[in-house]
Structures are given as C-alpha cells and as structure tokens.
Amino acid sequence: MRLFNWRRQAVLNAMPLVKPDQVRTPWHEFWRRFRRQHMAMTAALFVILLIVVAIFARWIAPYDAENYFDYDNLNNGPSLQHWFGVDSLGRDIFSRVLVGAQISLAAGVFAVFIGVAIGTLLGLLAGYYEGWWDRLIMRICDVLFAFPGILLAIAVVAVLGSGIANVIIAVAIFSIPAFARLVRGNTLVLKQQTFIESARSIGASDMTILLRHILPGTVSSIVVFFTMRIGTSIISAASLSFLGLGAQPPTPEWGAMLNEARADMVIAPHVAVFPALAIFLTVLAFNLLGDGLRDALDPKIKG
C-alpha cells in the first residue's frame, strides 16, 4: 500500500502544473485561430470602423448630407474643402457617403436579422419534427429559391411600395429560406446525437431540447452565414434603390446615390465612384469576415 501511494505521489509530482490562465477555453481557441488570419482581422477592423461611422455619421459628416448645397462648385472633383467632390446639386459627396453608411448598413443588418429569426425557427421545427411539417416548409423554401433573389425582392416592393422599410422586408423574405435550410440540416444531424437521446430519456420537453441542446449547436453556422449574408443584403438593398424602388431622393443611400449619378458619370465620374467603392469595400469586408469566422469556428480546420 505504501509503495502504491509512493508511486501515485511520484506521478502527481511529475505532472506539470497548469495555471488557470493557461487553460484553453473555446473562446481562447477561437481567438487563437481567428487572429492568425490577417485578411479576416483587417476585415473585422474595417467592419468595426464602419459601424462606428454609421452610428455617428450625422456628427462626423462635415456638411448636412441633404440640405447643404454648394452652387459654386457643381460636379467639382475631390478637393480640400470637399474630400469626395460635389454632385450636380452641390451636395458634399463625402458627407452623403458617411450618412449613407448608416442607412445601407441598417437596411442590410435588419433584413438579415428578420431572415435569421424566422428562418431559424422554421429550420428547427422542420428538422426536429420532420414529416408533413418538414415537407411543407421545404416546399415553400423551394418555391422561394426558384426565383432569383433580386426578382423576388422587386416583386415584393412592387406590391408593398417603395421605401427603405419595404426594401428591408423584401430582402428579409428571400433570406428566410436560406437560413431555414441551414438550420434544418444542422438539426437533422444533432437530433441523432446521444446527448439528445439522453435528454429525452430524462423527460426533457421538445422545447427544452430545441432551445437548450439543438439551437446552441447551430449558433456557429448561423453566425458565419449571418455575417456573409449582410453583404448580400446590402447589395440587394442598393440594387433596389438604384432601380428607384428603395430609398428615394434626397435620402443619401448608396444605391440611390448611384441612381442619381448616372446622368453625370461621363463628366463627373467621382459622383458614382465613391458610393460604388463604399458598397464594394463593405461587401468585401463582410465576406472576408465571414470566411474568417468559418475557419476559426470549424473544428475540422487545424492550425
């Protein structure tokens, strides 16, 4: 017995001591993976900067984005007074791009929020209960997927009328089936796991299983797809505004600014370049951020 205790003590003494701050939590592992991706980190910083600019755009903008007119410098290019130049009505483009970030980002984020809320609910129900409920939801999704997203959004706006609120609804509608399919697929896999059977065996209700066991298992996929979907929604909202179905002049929304710039693109290309560049960089940043989140959250990717 003494020999056994001596050996056990020797083994314990040989084991390295692990300090509390050296324990790797899931958050530490995620951050370790994510910070190694320089493109994703750059995109994350850009998105954070964009959010800050969008929140404080009205205070940051040097001029009123809607009611300031410099009639002496119509269509003038970038200068020290007007960093992005002036449009055909004398409005400062830099101020309008800043305020446009507020409108375009809000439209994209709110549309995806609606899509993820409804789509996640439908996906959980379809994947968990299956049967006729699953078939009904998936057939509706198939019908929505049969139409190009922008065409479906145009049809919705044509029924509801123009305006940024209706654009958000239209973009949200064609985001719903994408999230529903994603969550349904994850739910079908998770419901077969042994921990779900264990929860059922101790009498857990369907609601408890869905909210406490299955939904947390789908969060990482939802976060990644949510991030990447924001870029798609911003493009869709800008496209509708460009077609005259979204934000209406003089609202400084990026798509609406491109619509107004069409007549002056030849003589004053800067009027269209800066709103287009804002859309391009924003969408690129969200896509790169989504790629980085996917790589950091996927346990199959080593590094």
From Swiss-Prot:
Part of the ABC transporter complex GsiABCD involved in glutathione import. Probably responsible for the translocation of the substrate across the membrane. The keyword Transmembrane applies. It comes from Shigella flexneri. PROSITE patterns: ABC_TM1 (PS50928). It is a multi-pass membrane protein. Keywords: Cell inner membrane, Cell membrane, Membrane, Transmembrane, Transmembrane helix, Transport. Pfam families: BPD_transp_1, OppC_N. GO terms for molecular function: dipeptide transmembrane transporter activity. Residues 101-290 form the ABC transmembrane type-1 domain. GO terms for cellular component: plasma membrane. The chain crosses the membrane at residues 40-60, 105-125, 144-164, 165-185, 222-242, 266-286. InterPro entries: BP-dependent_transpt_permease, MetI-like, MetI-like_sf, OppC_N. Signal peptide: none annotated. It is found in: Cell inner membrane. The keyword Signal does not apply. The complex is composed of two ATP-binding proteins (GsiA), two transmembrane proteins (GsiC and GsiD) and a solute-binding protein (GsiB). It comes from the Bacteria. Belongs to the binding-protein-dependent transport system permease family. SUPFAM superfamilies: MetI-like. This is Glutathione transport system permease protein GsiD. Coiled coil: none annotated.
